[in-house]
């Protein structure tokens, strides 16, 4: 669908801008959406805190909710032992403005982008029909200037082969 293509391109542009301008990361080319999914939360629905593995950035696009009645904020938590590469084994425990819990109360039509390893979720929904679209991003090329790797989408047979090899299953 052409509308989804335009929306996807816009999301990728926003994620690339976030990576370069907010995170300060050196992204040689662009970022790409690797997967998307819809979240529908009726009254009483909630999302346990979680992070997204095997991903660089994640985003939530808020599609539908009644801001005055139904919306609960998305919260983000960053423990004092937050893993960051390279991982350093240091004693931590001090809460600062950078590792405290934060909440984001977004409006319909807003896109929130964040590092995928950041825990996030939301408490019990008080209304009906809270709909959001979530997605993950990866850079098309990851490099330090001397070496790197290219992130590509695998077709169905490539995914099956990679899974079978990982699980030690015979290739059929």
What kind of feature is each model-predicted range?
Residues 39-113, 123, 139-151:
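Catalytic core of non-heme Fe(II) oxygenases with the double-stranded beta-helix
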């Amino acid at each position: 669908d052409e509308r989804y293509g335009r929306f996807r391109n816009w999301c990728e542009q926003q994620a690339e801008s976030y990576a370069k301008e907010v995170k300060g990361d050196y992204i040689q080319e662009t970022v790409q959406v690797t997967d998307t999914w819809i979240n529908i939360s009726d009254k009483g629905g909630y999302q346990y805190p979680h992070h997204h593995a095997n991903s660089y950035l994640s985003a939530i696009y808020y599609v539908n909710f009644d801001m005055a009645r139904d919306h609960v904020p998305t919260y983000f938590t960053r423990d004092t032992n937050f893993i960051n590469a390279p991982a350093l084994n240091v004693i931590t425990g001090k809460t600062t403005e950078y590792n405290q819990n934060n909440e984001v109360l977004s409006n319909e039509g807003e896109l929130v982008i964040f590092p995928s390893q950041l825990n996030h979720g939301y408490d019990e929904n008080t209304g009906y029909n809270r709909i959001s679209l979530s997605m993950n991003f990866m850079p098309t090329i990851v490099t330090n200037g001397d070496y790197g790797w290219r992130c590509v989408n695998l077709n169905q047979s490539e995914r099956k082969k990679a899974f079978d090899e990982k699980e030690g299953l015979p290739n059929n």
